[in-house]
Amino acid sequence: MARLVGVDLPRDKRMEIALTYIYGIGRTRSKEILAATGISPEQRSKDLTDDQVTQLREYIEATLKVEGDLRREVQADIRRKIEIGCYQGLRHRRGLPVRGQRTKTNARTRKGPKRTIAGKKKAR
């Protein structure tokens, strides 16, 4: 099993897909990496030679910010926005959608489950 930047790549997937298991690498970037290293996107990760694994590892470490480094950078950016008190920071602090989505309805993922509020009592 090939191991790159702390992630075990799935053995039976094509390299184009297997690389997307690394945080920070999607389909497009995966294709770019394979083109730059000269590895076929159709090749399975179990069929990689040690030289190819080394080549991939060196390319990714030299040119991309992935996994732990990228996660830390994203968290630092969020913390910085919260500290400076910008609008996006306030939205993060309140646990609401940050990018202008509606909140009257929807936004349940960000806001969490509904909190039921007692309605008006019926008059008799």
Curated annotation (Swiss-Prot):
What protein does this entry describe?
A: Small ribosomal subunit protein uS13
Please tell me whether the keyword Ribosomal protein is annotated for this protein.
yes
Q: Assembly state and interactors?
A: Part of the 30S ribosomal subunit. Forms a loose heterodimer with protein S19. Forms two bridges to the 50S subunit in the 70S ribosome.
| Cystine pairs | none
**Do you know which PROSITE patterns this protein is assigned to?**
RIBOSOMAL_S13_1, RIBOSOMAL_S13_2
- Assigned GO CC terms: cytosol; small ribosomal subunit
State whether keyword rRNA-binding applies.
Answer: yes
| InterPro entries per the UniProt record, alphabetical | Rbsml_uS13_C, Ribosomal_uS13, Ribosomal_uS13-like_H2TH, Ribosomal_uS13_bac-type, Ribosomal_uS13_CS
**What organism is listed for this UniProt entry?**
Mycobacteroides abscessus (strain ATCC 19977 / DSM 44196 / CCUG 20993 / CIP 104536 / JCM 13569 / NCTC 13031 / TMC 1543 / L948) (Mycobacterium abscessus)
